[in-house]
Amino acid sequence: MSDKTVKSTNLMAFVATKMLERQEDLDTCTEMQVEKMKTSTKARLRTESSFAPRTWEDAIKDGELLFNGTILQAESPTMTPASVEMKGKKFPIDFAPSNIAPIGQNPIYLSPCIPNFDGNVWEATMYHHRGATLTKTMNCNCFQRTIWCHPNPSRMRLSYAFVLYCRNTKKICGYLIAKQVAGIETGIRKCFRCIKSGFVMATDEISLTILQSIKSGAQLDPYWGNETPDIDKTEAYMLSLREAGP
């Protein structure tokens, strides 16, 4: 077994525990799926005890570290909610009152903005990879990425979304429409794979258009306000996209 297997188990232990802490937000089907994930993760932990002995509590603690920090509560957002128009309908974008976790607090993600050859850091391009349609942003390495996992009782599936937050401008630079996936554990593993793939995010044509619309309205300050980024003061807020009315 590899170290990746151990890390994966620890991540699943942390996520399952955190989701069950919000049991009141889970419908019966989702709660059963998370409980099943917790049970299977504990079984993996026992299997790994021969080469990586640790307690369930240790696995949760390490999983939290791998997830990059304590879960933060999004409070009193300082940025104005926006909306974008698609096919005659307005999609409101609000700051969700749910928990978020900052991702990617390492030097490459905290470096200054790097424009592409045209001097445009907001460009997004689409391409296909292994059957999935992906959006890849052209280099702005100061983006603060976040991931949000929340149950959707109406569809009994897991929704997840990504937000790009520019530390230079203190503004949201882009986001992805929450995607629906069948199965809690499958969905969370997809989230982890997206995180590991850098600034490549699973999306579709509508998501790309909205992403470009948000980015086109953003302003870029190409210089740092401080010589050294202050990670502790970096704030990340999650956007949720409500379904448009009929």
UniProtKB/Swiss-Prot annotation:
GO molecular function: RNA binding
Cellular compartment(s): Host cytoplasm; Host nucleus
UniProt main location, coarse: host cell
Alphabetical UniProt keywords: Host cytoplasm, Host nucleus, Host-virus interaction, Inhibition of host innate immune response by virus, Inhibition of host interferon signaling pathway by virus, Inhibition of host RIG-I by virus, Inhibition of host RLR pathway by virus, Interferon antiviral system evasion, RNA-binding, Viral immunoevasion
Superkingdom of the source species: Viruses
GO cellular component term of the entry, any: host cell nucleus
GO biological process: symbiont-mediated suppression of host cytoplasmic pattern recognition receptor signaling pathway via inhibition of RIG-I activity; symbiont-mediated suppression of host type I interferon-mediated signaling pathway
Protein family: Belongs to the influenza C viruses NS1 family.
Biological role stated in the UniProt entry: Prevents the establishment of the cellular antiviral state initiated by host RIGI, which normally triggers the antiviral transduction signal that leads to the activation of type I IFN genes by transcription factors IRF3 and IRF7. Also participates in the up-regulation of the splicing of viral mRNAs.
Protein name, as recorded: Non-structural protein 1
Organism per entry: Influenza C virus (strain C/Yamagata/1964)
Organism phylogeny: Viruses, Riboviria, Orthornavirae, Negarnaviricota, Polyploviricotina
